[in-house]
């Protein structure tokens, strides 16, 4: 699930709670502004590909949207080869914990532990 917008849709379909935001990739700055108005600020523009905090920009008010949208999209394309971005509600000071689980076709499953990712390079 390297495409985060597609992963969001899959999680919603599976009943997993997700932050309010766009249903997929954004088509325009205007669409980002409309969604931000609907869900409230602050929001974050995020690259659909990649990770490590690249292609992400926090937007605290409408006057910041145009620059944030363009910068996130350009950075995403430069870093990952894909300019697509989406928007979601921004959480101040969240914790990012990942759990790694592997399974095979025979039903064998192994839990590799958890990882505290809140100290990643950005956001």
Locate the predicted segments by residue.
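N-terminal beta-alpha lobe that positions the nucleotide/phosphoryl donor
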Residues: 1-123
């Amino acid at each position: 699930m390297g495409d985060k917008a597609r992963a969001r849709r899959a999680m919603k379909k599976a009943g997993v709670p997700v932050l309010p935001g766009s249903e997929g990739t954004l088509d325009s700055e205007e669409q980002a502004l409309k969604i931000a108005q609907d869900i409230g600020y602050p929001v974050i523009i995020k690259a659909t590909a990649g990770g490590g905090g690249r292609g992400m920009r926090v937007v605290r008010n409408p006057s910041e949207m145009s620059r944030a949208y363009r910068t996130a999209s350009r950075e995403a394309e430069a870093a990952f080869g894909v300019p697509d971005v989406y928007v979601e509600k921004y959480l101040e000071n969240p914790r990012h914990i990942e759990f790694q689980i592997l399974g095979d076709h025979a039903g064998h499953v192994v839990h590799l532990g958890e990882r505290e990712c809140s100290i990643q390079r950005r956001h």
